[in-house]
Amino acid sequence: MDITKNNFAEQIDNITKNLKRSCFVGLDAEFTAILSGDGFKHRLFDTNKERYDLIKNEVSKMIMTQVGLTMFQYEREFDNYAAIGYTFHLCPQALADIDQSFIFQASTLKFLCKHNFDFNKFIYDGIPYLSRHEEKIIRQMIHDKTLNSNLIQKMEIEDEKKLQQCCSEVSRWLTSGEGETLYFDIESPVLRYIIHNEIRLRFPDVLTTDSLGNSNKVLIYRDKYVEGANSAPMAVLEDNLMNNILGFSQIINLLVEHKKPIIGHNLFLDVVLLHSQFIGPLPKYYSAFKKNVNNLFPIIFDTKYISHEMGKKLSYDELWNSNKLQDLYEFFSEGKCKKLEKGINFIKLSTPFNVKQSYHEAGWDSYCSGYCFIRLGHWAACETSGSYRPVGPKEKLAALDFYCNKINVIRGAVPYMNLVSDDPPSHRPTLLHIKSMKERMINIAKISSVIESSGSVDIKRYGNRTALIAAGTRNT
């Protein structure tokens, strides 16, 4: 189901209910940029700390434009799963001293167009959000009673005209003595907040509140003697404003509050962006970044890493084509896994998708990640018990616990990022040190051409006459 700013408020109660009922949540995201070029090339030399240090400044300029969440609910009576999928369309906002910015790479635009990304939903209908750091700034302004004046200073001309128009109309209405109430229909929650404040400031005797049944309406009573007159407490107006500007961050807060296991595929960049976009600026130290993420999201599974490790148990004839998400999903959904011939759960998706056109759509990919997790968990649980039979979600989670909080690392010195402990030691062969015996400056290009047929290797200069070679496997 597509969620935009137009239906977010009416759907948030259903989303909350479905999240609470879920046993785990699939997650996927689409970004405004990808880390490409020689400066961000994945190298076999890289430790996770080095890779984090390399990308953190660039990632801070990127945002998630779509977040897919699929809530998997276990129906014990039928031993089935109901999967409720959502695609949240996000858009940054400018508010007071906060002006969220980002980069869009041409290559990413091309990729998104190829996969039918809806830019109108992103720009016109995207849900706002705030990081926890930004939320703290706004709440401090509220506490200091400086938010309203700050918002007025940053108002666009059209909103400024609307504010003056409303205040002038209130003045004329009070002078004329006509009617006991007046109301304005104001779509923008920020402008609505400003109008409440300004009318109360300029006309101390009037009372203002949100009109019952229509939160877009500012209802004004001539004075406290009007029958039924009431004035919304400032705390209520502030809460209404915060709920609107927090937007999608309310969903992030629900994930944090309920501590549901989060399932994704190849999550390294997703996790870094989760911090940058919804927690706050990426910390200087890699260890602090891992601690922050784990404090808020204590249970994360990466099906890319799980499938890489469990795939080692399959023969060549049994193995999937690759463990890219599409290949892995089709391997399981088409019944190709010989380890899962009995007792597998039926998974019922509530949201229709055109499968062949939906990959790289965040909602669909979040479903695929959760689907693969269920199948991998069933396989692992049955392997542990020695028999293939029905397996519930708790048993699946327990069977895959070894892989919990281990985030796949592409082409690095170590296979995964450990969010709860030290990263593992390098699993690559010992580095090969070579030295030029004749030339005063070692020729890296020449070395590359000589060994390129040997397999997966990386080379880096190590002084004028020496270089280091990293191999992907001991068979290289």
Features from the language model and the residues they span:
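DEDD superfamily 3′-5′ metal-dependent exonuclease/proofreading module
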Residues: 1-476
